Each structure stands twice: as C-alpha cells, then as structure tokens.
C-alpha cells in the first residue's frame, strides 16, 4: 500500500490547531476544511487528465480536466467535515455515504448507513475520514467498496495510528493513504495518541 505523509508547514500549522484542546468547534471545522483541500491536492497530483479545447477572451487554447472524477465517500459522522471542501475542489465528483458508529465498550464498528452505487467498477473512490485509529471503520468501508467492484481506492485522513495503517494495508493492499501525521499509537480507549480527540465531537459537539 502506498502511504503518503504530507510534509508542509501550512498543513502542520492547521494540524496544530486541530490538536489544540482550546480550539473551538467552528475553528476546528475551518482547519479541517483547509487540511482537506491540501489532502485532495496531493491525492490528485497524478490523476489522469484529458485535454479540452477552450477559448480565452483573446484566443483559442487547450486546457486540462480530470479524465475520471472520483466518487467521494465520507465516513459519517466525522467525515462530513471533509466532504464539502473535497467536493468544491472536485465539483464533478459523485458523493456516496457510509455511516459507522463505534461501540465504546468493544471499540468495534457499528454500521448504520450505506448509500453507494451498486457497481464501482472503473470508478476511482476517495474515502474521507479525519481519523484512522484501529482501522475498524475504514476496513469495513473498504471491504464494502471492494465488494462493489472498486479497484482504485484512495483514503484521506488527517491523523493515523500505526495500527490503523496496518489494518488498512491488510484489507486493501492496493489502496493509497494520504495523511498529515502518523502518531505514536492508541490508548486503552483506542483513541489516537497524541491525536486530536474525537473528531466528530470536536466538530459537532457530543452525541
């Protein structure tokens, strides 16, 4: 599996804002949106393009556009904070949804929503989730995508734990992962350390 860790001072500054416990909900959402744009730019750096004929106010010329815009799949609820910015950068992308809660006793994923095309053959898929902790939610999501025929899967997250990276690689060895940081590991409650807390709660408030 390809693993790309974004090394850029602007990304690091926004990650610092996300980590800081003093950052409020609105500022957290803003920093997450800005980091999402960085992740999308990096993830599409080598995306296939096609030529398109256009006219400027002065002359005819040729430009580029993505040859095959992806399906964006935010993992709810934390991934909701990434989808608008990703869709703004990729306006022709389609959007699907996977909703997964976490059982706080077992730390296992509890799926509650799925809205995806039946056939994903030939369609690039970009999964959006700020956190890759145990990998339970992400492996459930990629297993679902693979079962629908997806072969081109890119995962965007802000912070990952080594355990989650390993779980994703086992589930989808041909996937690509783009993240801003790979942290030390997980605590006893299976939260990433140092991490940034519960990304859903920090965006939208406690459940």
Swiss-Prot record:
Its EC number is 2.4.2.9. It comes from Mycobacterium marinum (strain ATCC BAA-535 / M). Binds 1 Mg(2+) ion per subunit. The magnesium is bound as Mg-PRPP. It comes from the Bacteria. GO terms for molecular function: GTP binding; magnesium ion binding; uracil phosphoribosyltransferase activity. Catalyzes the conversion of uracil and 5-phospho-alpha-D-ribose 1-diphosphate (PRPP) to UMP and diphosphate. Allosterically activated by GTP. Signal peptide: none annotated. 5-phospho-alpha-D-ribose 1-diphosphate binds at residues 77, 102, 129-137, 198. The keyword GTP-binding applies. It is an enzyme of class 2 (transferase). Pathway: Pyrimidine metabolism; UMP biosynthesis via salvage pathway; UMP from uracil: step 1/1. Its cofactor is Mg(2+). One of its GO terms (biological process) is UMP salvage. The keyword Transferase applies. It catalyses: UMP + diphosphate = 5-phospho-alpha-D-ribose 1-diphosphate + uracil. The gene is upp. This is Uracil phosphoribosyltransferase. Uracil binds at residues 192, 197-199. Belongs to the UPRTase family. Keywords: Allosteric enzyme, Glycosyltransferase, GTP-binding, Magnesium, Nucleotide-binding, Transferase. PANTHER family: ADENINE PHOSPHORIBOSYLTRANSFERASE, URACIL PHOSPHORIBOSYLTRANSFERASE, CHLOROPLASTIC.
